[in-house]
Amino acid sequence: MKNDLQITHVSINLSMYALMQYLFLFDEDTIENHTHFFFGPGLNKEVCKNFRNATYFPNTSKLSPLRRLTLKLGLRITKNWKYPFLKTAKIYAQDQEYPSILIGRRDYSLLSDGPNCITIHMNDGSTIMALQRATNNTLKGKVVSLIYGDILLNYYGNNKYCKEFFMTEVNSSPILEGKIVHVNPLQELWNNSSTDKQRYILSKYNLYDEDMDTLRSKPIAYMSQPDVDNRLLSTEEQYNLVAAILKNYDSSQIIIKTHPRDTFDYRKYFPGITVFDKPVNMELLALAGIKFSKFITICSTSVFGIPYDTEIDWYGAEINSKLLAHYGEFNPNRPYTKMHLK
């Protein structure tokens, strides 16, 4: 790790999307020599290895409640000793989950969790907004806020410490009032980057020519979601749901493009379909020139940034009661075809 005096920026990333955004926003010197990265389990370890100044937080969801509590308290107590630069460095972060304890009560700038994430999650009627309001009024919520600060409960920038939002498109939400909002469309970020910078970003994601050839081999892409990893569906439920969707298409024309956090074994369950499971978000592939004639998805927000001349078959979270309870009902803010299971 670099001398702490050289660390002027902190980037807390829970998704490949937010990491991509940070890489566009800063130059290579800042990224390589003056940023310490904290990666959550949503980041692939092989990608994380490409960053010299980095700390990786493993998935804690399968640990006992006591073990998770011990880890949280340990991080709360030791963070400024282990990472003294947290006291002074500018913080750019996704503020959900366990790593948000690193922010504490410091000001920070929010990175995007994905396209339109604030519009989707931080408006009246959204599952997350309702959960935050309910939790804040409980004794447990008040204790958590006292120990860790408000951010652990009021994430997605819904707190007084989040001063800036870095978005890739215009979002709408009452929590944006009074905040500094930067809107940097991905295509503009890509176009404004030099060829060397574009190659640099692709190299961080371990993308090579043979990967591009695989992706270009099929005209239709199924965009997966990490619903088993998020413990929303069982393996059997995931298989049955995806099988019911894919039977509507010619399997020889499809490639399954997995979500970066999706570890479901599509090769095992769908042996006749090409699978691309490198942990790369579709938005970056689109910027690099990968184009499909059609995308199929349940409710992946990855399709929000896809060019309008690409067809979207959108099934929606309402095709499964567990997914609907988690995601809520929403639709793309672009042309799409609403699909139904037969």
Task: Give the role of each language-model region.
Residues 7-157, 303-304:
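Active-site and donor-binding regions of nucleotide-sugar-utilizing enzymes
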Residues 110, 282-327:
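A donor-sugar binding/catalytic signature common to diverse glycosyltransferases
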Residues 10-15, 38-41, 101-105, 122-123, ...:
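Short His-Asn-centered micro-motif
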Residues 32-36, 47-63, 115-120, 134-143, ...:
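Active-site regions of enzymes building and remodeling cell-envelope glycoconjugates
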